[in-house]
Design a protein with these regions (language model features):
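RNA-interacting cores
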Residues: 1-217
């Protein structure tokens, strides 16, 4: 059973600049670039189709920045202005033991910096820890239920369970949400979990807030 390797890169901006508030694609490109420079074969493995072997939290600024735009609208329209010396964190979770080993041995020793949309950041500190997904599931068995808030901080869609796969599900309907979660949990732990349909019968949405970027005509 694979462990999840969580790696945090603490970054410092070498110059001032601006980025979109949600920099998912830019962060992913920067991450795959530093992997490719250190180990091209590993970058191809991570970029290949099929089950995702990693999850990336986009660049998250901690100091030396301010958010502009998006007031009264979706934050997806906002931007981040930051100064030289601004601090940020990029976090990646690796879901495969061999990928984790190669990342730790081949990439981290030479990962001195990365470039996000033409803006350079130097790596100031690195931290890594292991998460046992089986213990996470076992720990949740004592949960007595009740309300649970779910926040999607990045644009998210679900693949339909039936029908034309080209049309995605934008609404976080419980069945599709649970199908995604149980599939990931089973792939990581091998534990047999209740069917998503059985879980969905016990859940209802009590409140919902969805925001999308404004589309120009």
């Amino acid at each position: 059973m694979p462990y999840i390797m969580v790696v945090q890169m603490e970054l410092v901006a070498t110059s001032g600049g601006s980025l979109p508030w949600f920099s998912g694609s830019e962060s992913r490109g920067a991450f795959l670039s530093i992997v490719g420079q250190a180990c091209e074969e590993l970058a191809k493995t991570l970029h290949s189709g099929g089950r995702s072997l990693y999850a990336l939290k986009p660049l998250n600024f901690k100091s030396g920045y301010r958010v502009v735009g998006g007031k009264g609208r979706s934050l997806a329209e906002a931007g981040v202005l930051f100064e030289r010396g601004a601090r940020a964190v990029l976090e990646v979770s690796l879901f495969d033991d061999e990928v984790s080993r190669r990342f730790i041995s081949n990439v981290l020793p030479v990962a001195t910096g990365l470039t996000v949309k033409g803006i350079s950041f130097r790596v100031d500190a690195l931290a890594a820890h292991l998460v046992d997904p089986l213990k996470v599931i076992e720990g949740s068995r004592d949960w007595e239920g009740g309300a649970l808030d779910v926040h999607f901080h990045t644009p998210t869609y679900f693949n339909p369970l039936t029908g034309d796969q080209r049309y995605k599900i934008l609404y976080p309907e419980p069945l599709h949400l649970l199908a995604s979660l149980t599939a990931s949990a089973h792939a990581l732990t091998g534990v047999d979990l209740p069917k998503p349909s059985e879980l969905a019968e016990c859940i209802y949405i009590s409140g919902l807030s969805i925001r999308t970027p404004r589309m120009e005509a």
